[in-house]
Regions:
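Conserved FAD/dinucleotide-binding core of flavoprotein oxidoreductases
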Residues: 258-262, 291, 350-377
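Mid-domain catalytic core of redox enzymes
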Residues: 237-349
Length: 472
């Protein structure tokens, strides 16, 4: 008898879970509330005066390239493209910090901090193929490579603001803190180094590539593989109650924990239901997409070759901005993550007009327009930018939430990475994917290894579901 599975949500984790189950012979149905699959991996052409391809949310993929959840998708059209420089962090009145895939090349550019940078990232990045087996699963588990994991894990427990002080140069301090700021949390908290150490280690092994043809190429490839395996994908199909769920042997939610609590209700234990409803969401993103004629006039021209640009100023400026956001205040000089995907994937541009992707970290639910604040912040490091802007499109926290139910209040990470949630996940217990109710699982970015287009939470949840199915 053919077993069946229902996946609620078609973000990268939902699609990865669906793929893993379908490859095991399970008949899979994916239900997506929006009219388009992909969740945070969608891409679109939002401008009216020029034809530019823009990523909606996820844009750079140091954790996705090489992910077991995405294995084999090259056969379905997924192609990675790498920029000449992975990431740049411009500084006022000083040379920019440059991140290269090569640890050695990065270290050379960091001068006096080169040896320290290599000491922190050299060995873990060279061993990333083995290390990732532990990093891409639950935080609490029996490690496959305990010594490697211990060496990697020790610095991750430190506050990013503290670990950055191990470096002497403003470039190294800013480069590290900028990476840590991807966590969208106070950088003075314990474990706030974890995301920074993780993506820098992965990046030194994998680079920070983009998907050719937009991040949506990831979800398109996954969809193609699913259809080939006989799966069904239904869009514009919202699951709001238990009655909306078909009867299946396995049901996996690529949703917020609170949605699982709403849909399953009394089928969950009181403890799980309470934990899911208490799950905390973090700060928001305010996104500004710019059509720029002639490229961005960065003060340091090398920044123009970088796929990712961290506009945060000094390490101290970034720490202050993230602290303000966490406290509910809009900083005058926010941390802005800028994407120049077109340097690796030229088809995204339209002649000499290029798409500049930029999102600022802002307080959750911010309800006013900060477009000028974001542009002003970028222009501090690229004087004359405004005169080159052809068209502007903004995505507010409310717009993010309206187009993706997982982005509560504009939180594009699907939950705060506070120490408690980082270690315990959405509910107490050894397994963050099992809901405690047989046959039902959670696989969104609210579960380890967290945000990104890597799909590993989906693969991990599917593996749990298959293990449990064999025991029934």
């Amino acid at each position: 008898m053919t077993r069946s599975a229902t996946i609620v949500g078609s973000g990268p984790n939902g699609l990865a879970a669906a793929l893993a189950l379908a490859r095991d012979g399970i008949h899979v149905t994916v239900l997506e509330a929006e009219s388009e699959i992909g969740g945070g991996t969608r891409s679109h052409r939002p401008f009216t005066t020029v034809d530019l391809l823009v990523d909606h949310c996820a844009g750079f993929h140091p954790m996705a390239v090489g992910s077991p959840a995405l294995a084999g998708l090259e056969q379905h059209g997924l192609t990675w493209r790498w920029p000449e420089i992975d990431c740049a962090h411009p500084l006022l009145d000083d040379a920019a910090a440059l991140l290269h895939r090569s640890v050695n090349e990065t270290a050379v550019g960091l001068g006096a901090d080169g040896k320290r940078w290599k000491a922190l990232f050299g060995q873990p990045s060279s061993s990333y193929d083995r290390l990732s087996a532990d990093l891409l699963g639950p935080v609490v588990h029996l490690p496959r490579h305990p010594l490697l994991l211990a060496r990697f894990g020790a610095p991750t427990a430190l506050p990013a603001a503290v670990l950055s002080r191990a470096f002497a140069t403003p470039q190294a301090r800013a480069l590290f803190v900028g990476a840590a700021a991807h966590a969208m949390r106070p950088l003075t908290e314990v474990f706030s180094s974890a995301i920074g150490v993780g993506i820098l280690t992965a990046g030194h092994h994998n680079g920070w590539p983009v998907a050719e043809g937009g991040t949506a190429a990831i979800s398109r490839a996954m969809h193609s593989a699913l259809i080939e395996l006989g799966a069904t994908v239904q869009t514009s199909t919202r699951v709001a109650s238990r009655a909306d769920l078909p009867s299946s042997d396995i049901t996996i939610f690529d949703t917020t924990p609170s949605v699982v609590a709403d849909v399953l209700g009394q089928e969950l234990t009181t403890r799980t239901r309470r934990s899911y409803n208490r799950f905390r969401h973090g700060p928001a993103a305010f996104k500004v997409d710019l059509a720029v004629r002639g490229g961005v006039p960065w003060t340091d021209p090398r920044v123009a070759q970088a796929g990712t640009v961290h506009v945060g100023g000094s390490a101290e400026d970034t720490v202050a901005a993230e602290a303000a956001v966490a406290a509910g205040r809009m900083p005058d000089r926010p941390f802005v993550l800028v994407g120049q995907q077109f340097v690796a994937d030229p088809q995204r541009a339209d002649g000499d007009v290029v798409p500049l992707y930029a999102y600022a970290h802002v307080p959750a639910g911010l309800d006013h327009d900060v477009t000028d604040v974001v542009i002003d912040r970028i222009e501090q490091f690229a004087p004359g930018l405004r005169s080159r802007i052809v068209e502007t499109v903004t995505t507010s926290p409310q717009s993010f939430a309206g187009g993706n139910a997982n982005f509560v209040g504009g939180d594009i990470l699907c939950g705060t990475s506070s120490p408690t949630q980082l270690l315990l996940g959405p509910r107490p217990g050894r397994d963050p994917y099992r809901t405690g109710t047989p046959g039902f699982y959670l696989c969104s970015a609210a579960t380890p290894p967290g945000p990104g287009a890597h799909g590993m939470a989906g693969l991990n949840a599917a593996r749990r579901a298959l293990d449990d199915l064999l025991k029934r």
